[in-house]
A protein has these predicted regions:
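Peri-catalytic and regulatory segments of divalent metal-dependent proteins
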Residues: 22-109
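C-terminal motif of bacterial Sec signal peptides marking the signal peptidase cleavage site
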Residues: 16-20
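Bacterial N-terminal signal peptides that target proteins for export
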Residues: 1-9
Length: 109
């Protein structure tokens, strides 16, 4: 009886882990698609900043943080980290599942 209970508990736990991994992968994929679409709109408006000192500084800090974020990632999935700097006086930044981020220059300037 105990052996059957342990086997059942293991099966339930394993299926929960497998299901959550599949869900995380789907969520990350949907987020990546939405991120690409949103960045395309912003890029078409000429609002992506890749060359200013602010953008370079944000990317520098971001690149230093990624290894620590990878260590803390407990999803079992690798993230494809991306950040885009948006030229705007707005005080804003946002992140999406799977390591997609946007940072507005207004937070730094």
């Amino acid at each position: 009886m105990k052996k059957q209970l342990k086997s059942f508990a293991f099966a339930v736990l394993a299926s929960a882990v497998i299901t959550s991994c599949a869900d995380s992968a789907s969520i990350n994929q949907q987020a990546a698609s939405s991120y690409t679409q949103e960045m395309g709109k912003i890029r078409s408006q000429g609002a992506i900043d890749t060359t200013s000192n602010t953008a370079r500084r944000i990317h520098h800090v971001f690149n230093k943080m990624v290894p620590y974020a990878n260590q803390a990632n407990e999803t079992g999935l690798e993230f494809n980290w991306q950040i885009n700097v948006i030229k705007s006086k707005e005080l804003n930044a946002w992140a999406m599942p799977g390591g997609k981020m946007a940072f507005y220059t207004g937070l730094v300037d």
